[in-house]
Amino acid sequence: MSARLFSVDSDSQRIEHFDDGIFLLRGFANSTELMAQVRIVCASAPLRHMTVPGGKQMSVAMSNCGPLGWTSDSSGYRYSATDPRTGNSWPAMPDAFMSLATRAATAAGFRNFKPDACLINEYQSKAKLSLHQDRDECDFTQPIVSVSMGADAVFQFGGLRRNDAKKSLLLQDGDVLVWGGPARLRYHGVGPPLADCRTGAALRVNLTLRNAA
């Protein structure tokens, strides 16, 4: 494991206890090196806009790596060992992703986390994810690890019911968000990437690592 994949500066690696079961690790990831691995994965399993069961196309472009990949189509939401576009296995999960996820989960108090699925989301312009629960996994005792790269975005946590009050936090490049325990089934979503005030660029990539099986 390369130490360069993680920030060791205590000023940039602040662990914030956002709420019960929710932890934010500021500047924990080296997005430059992680993005190099994302490009390799997406060369084998290109990003695509999946459809939800109702037929609407998602604004977020997605791909997967690891033994299992999350997919959505007219048949519903599910994990699959193969890419439905090609019938091939998803690309192997890079060691860098696995190492980052297990280290972040441990830092947040969730030991023995072993992700078998990594969803790659690309947010361009107005792309966003509305409030939802992650309920397609088999073991809800396992946390979720979310890695932000690129443009800033506002992440929201609701409660265990869709209409519960929401709390917001700003996610920035290199931030890692971990939630589990009492927060595992909380509704959550993320807004569109925020444009850089200097360049106008608004591109965000996110890794979501889970234990799905």
Question: Residue locations for each model-derived region?
Answer:
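Non-heme Fe(II) oxygenase metal-center motifs and adjacent flexible, charged/small-residue loops
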Residues: M1-A213
